[in-house]
Design a protein with these regions (language model features):
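Short, conserved charged micro-motifs
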Residues: 83-88, 133
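Amphipathic alpha-helical coiled-coil/heptad-repeat segments
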Residues: 98-99, 117, 121-157
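Sequence-specific dsDNA recognition surfaces
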Residues: 1-3, 15-44
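Short, ligand-facing micro-motifs at secondary-structure edges
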Residues: 19-30, 47-71, 87-91, 99-104
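A short glycine-rich beta-alpha junction/loop motif
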Residues: 68-76, 87, 107-126
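Short beta-alpha junctions and helix-cap segments that line functional grooves
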Residues: 1-2, 60-64, 74, 110
Length: 157
C-alpha cells in the first residue's frame, strides 16, 4: 500500500508485529477508510494466526481480536460462529504449536511460511461443550497463577 492516502487513518491494520499478546486491542499501524474499502474488516473475536514470517522459526503467533480490524497478507483470520468454539480453537492450536512449528512450517529462501493446506486439514479434538468449558476454566486458572510469576526476576533465571 504505497499510496500515502491509505495511511494514518483510524482503522487498525494488524501485522505480525502486533501479535505479541493473546488479545489485540490496537495496532501499530492504522489505515484510512479509502484503504479499508478494498479490505475485509474482521470483527472482534476473530482469531488471527501468523502464516508467513521469520518468527515461525520459533513461535506460532496466535491472537484474538479485541477490536474490529483489518489484517495484512501474512496473517490468516478465523471467524467462528460460536465464541466458545473460538476459545477452544485458540487453546487447541496452542496445544499443537510444537507439532505445527516442526511439521507444518516450510523454510524458503526468504521467509518461513505455514503449509496452510496441511494446517487446515489438521484435526483438533472437540469435546462436548461442558467439557470444553471445564478445560478452558482450568487453563485460565493455571495462566492466572503463572502471570504473577512472569514478572518475578527469579522466574527468568
Amino acid at each position: 500500500m504505497s499510496n500515502p492516502q491509505f495511511w494514518n487513518g483510524n482503522i487498525p491494520w494488524v501485522t505480525s508485529k502486533d501479535m505479541k499478546r493473546p488479545v489485540i486491542t490496537d495496532s501499530e499501524m492504522h489505515i484510512s477508510e479509502l484503504a479499508a474499502s478494498s479490505m475485509q474488516l474482521y470483527p472482534a473475536g476473530t482469531l488471527l494466526l501468523v502464516a508467513r514470517s521469520g518468527i515461525l522459526k520459533r513461535l506460532l503467533p496466535l491472537c484474538k481480536l479485541g477490536i474490529d480490524s483489518t489484517i495484512n497478507q501474512d496473517i490468516k483470520a478465523f471467524s467462528l460462529y460460536d465464541i466458545e468454539l473460538s476459545e477452544w480453537l485458540f487453546y487447541g492450536i496452542k496445544a499443537f504449536e510444537p507439532f505445527i512449528l516442526k511439521e507444518l512450517v516450510k523454510s524458503v529462501t526468504t521467509v518461513e511460511s505455514l503449509k496452510f493446506d496441511e494446517f487446515s486439514a489438521m484435526l483438533i479434538p472437540v469435546p462436548p461443550l461442558s467439557e470444553q468449558r471445564r478445560i478452558i476454566a482450568a487453563i485460565k486458572t493455571a495462566m492466572n497463577l503463572l502471570t504473577p510469576l512472569s514478572s518475578n526476576p527469579l522466574f527468568s533465571l
